[in-house]
Amino acid sequence: MFKNTVISIKSSGNLIVLKTEAGSAGPAAELIDKLSYDEVLGVIAGDNTIFVAVDGLDHVDTIRRRLEDLLEANRLFN
């Protein structure tokens, strides 16, 4: 599911912003919530954008890489 919906992953400050196909931010955000990363304070989804609030700037790169790895793994196996 993740590979078919996420277009890009970028970060700014302690936020990670994921752009998705129209209408698919909600299911992708739910998946991120279910991953239960301790460093993630919360996830908010609109129609085609997801904001992931990270607990401190020092964890942003780690969480962004995990999400990018998840996206790449889904592309390889689907």
What is the role of each PLM region?
Residues 74-78:
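Long, charge-dense
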Residues 1-64, 70:
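Non-DNA-binding regulatory cores of transcription-related proteins
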